[in-house]
UniProtKB/Swiss-Prot annotation:
Heptamer of 7 subunits arranged in a ring. Interacts with the chaperonin GroEL. This is Co-chaperonin GroES. NCBIfam families: PRK00364.1-2, PRK00364.1-5, PRK00364.2-2, PRK00364.2-4, PRK00364.2-5. It comes from Thioalkalivibrio sulfidiphilus (strain HL-EbGR7). It holds the Pfam family Cpn10. Belongs to the GroES chaperonin family.
Length: 96
């Protein structure tokens, strides 16, 4: 992917949610919400602090993250839909 986010922004590819319930019921596309989990595919250099220093981001490429339903801005790059958001919009990193 040919995009490099600036400053404290990250590029996230949404992870598909499970479309079948535990009971085996298949959920149609029209009934599913957009996933709120994704994988970080690019990160900026860091947040510029008031004193001019750059603080490195806590997330890194490959991290699986959680974010709000309305977080970020959807864009299309190389035919692929991704989200651009600030690191502060990420709620957590999935471990393990």
């Amino acid at each position: 992917m040919n995009i490099r986010p600036l400053h404290d922004r990250v590029i996230i590819k949404r992870m598909e949610e499970e479309r079948t319930t535990a009971g085996g019921i298949v959920i149609p596309d029209s009934a599913t919400e957009k996933p709120v989990r994704g994988e970080v595919i690019a990160v900026g250099k860091g947040k510029i602090l008031e004193n001019g220093e750059v603080r490195a981001l806590d997330v890194k490429v490959g991290d699986k993250v959680l974010f709000g339903k309305y977080s970020g801005t959807e864009i299309k790059v190389d035919g692929q839909e991704v989200l651009v958001m600030r690191e502060e919009d990420i709620m957590g990193v999935l471990e393990g």
